[in-house]
């Protein structure tokens, strides 16, 4: 989705979240009508330039989904682990934080919504600039 936005194409990232980090085909099939209705609504929206929607579906049957929440981006926190592995070409690689993950974030975060049985919809922008700090940092710098 981020690549699409960089090319000027409105984009939606849709993920199956929560529970085991593997897709259950029966659950995905059950959620098709919910996803179709949600996408019908979301694709009708006019999104600002450089914006994408990050949608996370809870690992529940469609009948158990409690609704949709507009959310803020939470933060996934991985355990402090370093695993030495090999890639498919037999090159040595390191996987950082490959253990179990937890999350942190406010009550209005995407993780909280999904954990509580809601679909989370988080508007994201590609510009990660901390604008307030940028303005403050201009005071730090003087030309040599």
Regions found by a protein language model. Name each.
Residues 7, 41, 45:
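Mid-sequence acidic-hydrophobic segments that form the walls
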Residues 14-23, 48-54:
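Short, surface-exposed recognition loops or helix-turn segments adjacent to catalytic cores
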Residues 1, 22-23, 27-42:
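Active-site glycine-rich loop that binds ribose-phosphate moieties when present
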Residues 45-48, 52-54, 58-144:
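C-terminal accessory domains and tails appended to enzymatic cores
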Residues 16, 23-26, 30, 64-68:
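A short secondary-structure junction signal
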Residues 1-19:
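Internal, conserved structured core segments that host functional sites
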């Amino acid at each position: 989705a981020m690549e699409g936005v960089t090319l000027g194409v409105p984009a939606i990232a849709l993920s199956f979240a929560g529970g085991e980090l593997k897709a259950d085909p029966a659950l995905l099939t059950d959620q098709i009508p919910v996803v179709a209705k949600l996408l019908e609504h979301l694709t009708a929206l006019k999104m600002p330039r450089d914006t994408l929607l990050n949608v996370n579906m809870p690992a529940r049957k469609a009948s158990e989904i409690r609704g949709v929440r507009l959310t803020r981006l939470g933060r996934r926190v991985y355990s402090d682990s370093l695993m030495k592995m090999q890639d498919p070409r037999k090159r040595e690689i390191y996987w950082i934080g490959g253990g179990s993950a937890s999350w942190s974030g406010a009550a209005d975060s995407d993780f909280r919504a999904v954990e509580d049985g809601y679909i989370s919809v988080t508007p994201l922008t590609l510009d990660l600039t901390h604008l307030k700090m940028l303005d403050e940092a201009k005071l730090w710098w003087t030309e040599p």
